[in-house]
Structure formats: structure tokens, C-alpha cells
Amino acid sequence: MTIADNKKAFFDYFIEERFEAGIVLEGWEVKAIRAGRVQIKEGYVVVRDAEMFLIGAHISPLQSASTHVNPDPVRTRKLLLKADEIKKLIGKVEQRGYTLVPLNLHYTRGRVKCEIGLGKGKKLFDKRETEKQRDWQREKSRIMKGGSKE
């Protein structure tokens, strides 16, 4: 079940590979995610010392958060992947033009997981082409549905 999608990632990048990663979360963050108070549109993934971190994902704390915990909505969160996956991703990211972006947050067997994508940035003309294709698909479905009302 999907919790949050990053539609902007598909508009800005050609996604070549996808990986599922666990996330190290605090208790209040899990509660907030279950309540749907998460946004990953501004998020990105970085590699530091052979570890992966999710930066810029915003998890809004609930009003009922504990008083002894000081919630930080945009803190850096560690991603959990297998060592061989991390090595593979480090090799790819060091190549020119590749980056790691969070694609969505979802549940797998009751745990919150983050799907990350290895993407190559789109140029402006690629984005325009994607927009034209989307408009054409929409227009095609209108025509097939019953024509335009003019």
C-alpha cells in the first residue's frame, strides 16, 4: 500500500533502476506516516561513508507528539540496503549525470519502506516531450470515449 508518491521524480528524471530500502525512523515519525503526514517531493538520497541517507523528506509531527521528544520534520534519515546494492549504487552515482531520488513510501509486511530510483536528469526538451505525450494520451482517450463536444 502506497503512503506517498513522488510524481516530480518521474517528471525530472529518467528512472532506470528501482530499489526498496528500509528507513530508520523514530516512534513519532511512524505515527505521523501512518496518519499520512509525509511529503517526499523535495527529498533526495546521498551516499556518505558507504551508507545512504534520505534528506529533505518532510514528516509533520502529530499534535499529540510526546513532550520529551523534540520532533525535527526534515531530519536526515538513514536508508537500509544490502551491502552489494549500496556498492552497485555508489558505482552508478559516481558516473556523470546519475542521481538517487525517493520514488514512494509504502508498507511491506507492516514496515515502512522507501522505493528509491536511480535516475538520469531530463533536459528541458525531454520534459516538453513528456508533456506532449501525456496531452496526446489524454486527447486520444477523449476521442475514443465519445468524441469532443464542439
From Swiss-Prot:
GO terms for biological process: trans-translation. GO terms for cellular component: cytosol. It comes from Cupriavidus pinatubonensis (strain JMP 134 / LMG 1197). This is SsrA-binding protein. It is found in: Cytoplasm. It comes from the Bacteria. InterPro entries: SmpB (IPR023620), SsrA-bd_prot (IPR000037), SsrA-bd_prot_CS (IPR020081). Belongs to the SmpB family. Keywords: Cytoplasm, RNA-binding. HAMAP family: SmpB.
